[in-house]
Amino acid sequence: MRNTLFGILFLFILPLQAHQKLPYLQKQGSTTQLKVDGKPFLVIGGELGNSSASSIEDIERIFPKLQRMGLNTVLVPAYWDLTEPQEGKFDFTLTDKVIQQARANDLKVVFLWFGAWKNSMSCYAPIWFKEDYKKYPRAYTKAGKSLEIASSFSENVLQADSRAFSQWMKHIASVDKEEGTVIMIQIENEIGMLEDARDYSKEADKLFYAPVPSLFIGYLQKNKRSLHPEMLAKWESQGFKKKGTWQEVFGADVYTDEIFMAWPYAQYVERMAKLARSIYNIPLYVNAE
């Protein structure tokens, strides 16, 4: 009987231990704490420059210096254009080198996915993506100027970005799930618009003058007490309307334009995050312009 009970407990403990190897976020009162190997982990990190991890030689040269600086974590860009140089063909050489060098120098890694957007622009998207502007449309200024910013309203843009990100996540899971060198991943980098506050493409205009999505209004209603004061003030200025276009609900100014753009960006990233979590459930986050 004792051996049988031990065997049953062993079967239950093994999955638990495997789960605890993955980093995760845990609420601690009003704050959120990063846990690595089941313990609180304070990131003493340094972030590489935008293109500092674009060659094996640079990675091998930089990582030993980071250890000597007393860091325990390095934030490293991962480039869509170098990960999928040809559509549907993936190269994870740089990712593998980052993980290998991090382990050799006793460092954890936070990857920054430079996908459809990096500092608003689509400069790290692959050439094949940039050249096919009909399939992967751009954002436009009010004056009608095409920007080197992929449209956040395009399903094709999302699918291409998400496919590459998912394949990359699968690879990380396959090579790092046991070691746990990669502790977090940032999706995109400083997403947002430049030159104008919102996209003026035909698709964007169509949605801007359409009713605010009920899902967004529902979120505002449910979280009214915890909304950012400026967000609450914008909504209040129009009488806390529950229906109407973006300008009817929030007013006609540049801040409404920004709220309008925040919605498709948030939906885009959340869809990528949901798929990524189903592949490899480690902490994901986003920063903003």
List PLM regions with ranges:
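A cross-family glycoside hydrolase active-site/sugar-binding cleft signature
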Residues: 44-49, 75-77, 110-114, 186-188, ...
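Positively charged n-region of N-terminal signal peptides that target proteins for export
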Residues: 1-4
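Short, well-ordered coil/turn segments that N-cap beta-strands
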Residues: 42-44, 70-72, 103-109, 174, ...
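Polysaccharide-binding and catalytic clefts of secreted carbohydrate-active enzymes
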Residues: 125, 132-289
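N-terminal carbohydrate-binding accessory modules
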Residues: 18-71
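Hydrophobic h-region of N-terminal signal peptides that target proteins for export
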Residues: 9-18
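Solvent-exposed loop/turn segments at secondary-structure junctions
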Residues: 41, 49-53, 79-83, 115-119, ...
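Aromatic-lined substrate-binding rim segments of carbohydrate-active enzymes
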Residues: 58-133, 269-279
